[in-house]
C-alpha cells in the first residue's frame, strides 16, 4: 500500500514539474492541417475536393505564420503580441477569402462563430486573446 502511494506521489510530482517547464513544442503544419480537416469535415461534411482546397489554404496559412513567428522571435526577445497580430492579419485575411470560396455563406458564418474559436484555444481551454 505504501509503495502504491509513493509511486502515485512521484508520478504526480513529475507531471507537475513537466507542466511548469513550458517546453511547448508547436505541432507540425501537417498535424494542424489534419486537425482543421477533421473539424471542417465533421462540421460541414464537405466534398473531398473542397476539403483538399481547405487543406491547402490552411497549410499556406500555417507555414506563413510559422515563418513570421520565427522571424519576429529571431531577435532574441519576445515580440509584442499586438505587432505579431497585425503582421499575421494579412495571412488570416487571405485564408478567410479562400474559405469563403469553399464554404457557403452559412457555413462560413458557422465557421467564424463556432469552429474557428475552438482552433484558437490554448492548452487549458483558454481562448487566445
Predicted segments, located by residue:
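Charge-rich (acidic/polar
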Residues: 20-129
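Bacterial Sec-dependent N-terminal signal peptides
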Residues: 1-25
Amino acid at each position: 500500500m505504501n509503495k502504491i502511494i509513493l509511486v502515485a506521489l512521484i508520478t504526480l510530482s513529475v507531471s507537475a514539474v513537466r507542466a511548469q517547464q513550458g517546453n511547448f513544442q508547436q505541432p507540425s503544419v501537417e498535424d494542424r492541417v489534419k486537425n482543421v480537416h477533421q473539424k471542417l469535415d465533421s462540421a460541414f461534411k464537405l466534398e473531398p475536393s473542397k476539403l483538399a482546397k481547405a487543406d491547402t489554404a490552411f497549410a499556406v496559412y500555417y507555414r506563413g505564420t510559422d515563418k513570421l513567428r520565427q522571424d519576429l522571435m529571431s531577435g532574441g526577445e519576445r515580440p509584442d503580441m499586438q505587432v505579431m497580430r497585425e503582421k499575421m492579419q494579412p495571412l488570416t485575411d487571405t485564408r478567410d477569402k479562400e474559405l469563403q470560396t469553399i464554404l457557403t455563406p452559412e457555413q462560413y458564418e458557422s465557421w467564424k462563430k463556432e469552429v474557428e474559436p475552438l482552433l484558437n484555444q490554448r492548452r487549458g481551454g483558454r481562448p487566445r486573446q
